[in-house]
Amino acid sequence: MTMMDMNFKYCHKIMKKHSKSFSYAFDLLPEDQRKAVWAIYAVCRKIDDSIDVYGDIQFLNQIKEDIQSIEKYPYEHHHFQSDRRIMMALQHVAQHKNIAFQSFYNLIDTVYKDQHFTMFETDAELFGYCYGVAGTVGEVLTPILSDHETHQTYDVARRLGESLQLINILRDVGEDFENERIYFSKQRLKQYEVDIAEVYQNGVNNHYIDLWEYYAAIAEKDFRDVMDQIKVFSIEAQPIIELAARIYIEILDEVRQASYTLHERVFVYKRKKAKLFHEINSKYHRI
């Protein structure tokens, strides 16, 4: 195993640890594509964790500077400051793919702002946040998952990322509240007459369910729109993207089956993932 292979393996371990659903799906890509996904996921994970886990603004700055070095001089040797193995893997990808570096910087800017979290006044602010933390990831992955990047391809990948982030929010309402964060907008909380603290203490009520389902309907519509346009991605990537998205959309039904609880984090069981795999495999005849 070469040093570069070890770098990619390290990135893969990060992906498997933090997103079993993504790993389950994207590990089915051809080797070069899946390695690129591992590297990009690992970079995005480190960006997210720099503040949330490590509380280290200097580390986030180092990540940004390392990415800028790769963008400016992709073929030169660099003394990376943040995580050398991840950055070497990213540099290798950048030498072969047209990376949307600005999307990395948009993600970093969102993480900077997230240090001083305040509740969103409107849904527009919430959806802007979903773009910043996840739509950006869709954009960065676009050259890996498509043969020819077009405006439509970037748009579909962006919308998929935003939809998955909204599903994350719907899954983690209780956990986020425990961390003093409420991502639903004040506008919508007022409209549906919901107080998250009251729901957390006293249990789910119809007002909360209606609010939750309002946002779930948005995520489900975006999912359907992405599936309708899935052919913008490469033939190899289409079944993989559909599998990842189908696994994620199942989270919403798991929350429903758990009675919308704020005190338990739901997940999609391996048996369900395997069933989805076989359904999509039959559809495409090729995974």
UniProtKB/Swiss-Prot annotation:
It holds the Pfam family SQS_PSY. Its cofactor is Mg(2+). It comes from Staphylococcus aureus (strain bovine RF122 / ET3-1). It catalyses: 2 (2E,6E)-farnesyl diphosphate = 15-cis-4,4'-diapophytoene + 2 diphosphate. GO terms for biological process: carotenoid biosynthetic process. SUPFAM superfamilies: Terpenoid synthases. It comes from the Bacteria. Binds 2 Mg(2+) ions per subunit. The keyword Magnesium applies. Its EC number is 2.5.1.96. InterPro entries: Isoprenoid_synthase_dom_sf (IPR008949), Squ/phyt_synthse (IPR002060), Squalene/phytoene_synthase_CS (IPR019845), Trans_IPPS_bact-type (IPR044843), Trans_IPPS_HH (IPR033904). Pathway: Carotenoid biosynthesis; staphyloxanthin biosynthesis; staphyloxanthin from farnesyl diphosphate: step 1/5. Involved in the biosynthesis of the yellow-orange carotenoid staphyloxanthin, which plays a role in the virulence via its protective function against oxidative stress. Catalyzes the head-to-head condensation of two molecules of farnesyl diphosphate (FPP) into the colorless C(30) carotenoid 4,4'-diapophytoene (dehydrosqualene). Keywords: Carotenoid biosynthesis, Magnesium, Metal-binding, Transferase, Virulence. (2E,6E)-farnesyl diphosphate 1 binds at H18, S19, K20, S21, Y41, R45, R171, Y248. This is 4,4'-diapophytoene synthase. Belongs to the phytoene/squalene synthase family. CrtM subfamily. Disulfide bonds: none annotated. Mg(2+) 2 binds at N168, D172. One of its GO terms (molecular function) is geranylgeranyl diphosphate synthase activity. (2E,6E)-farnesyl diphosphate 2 binds at R45, Q165. Mg(2+) 1 binds at D48, D52.
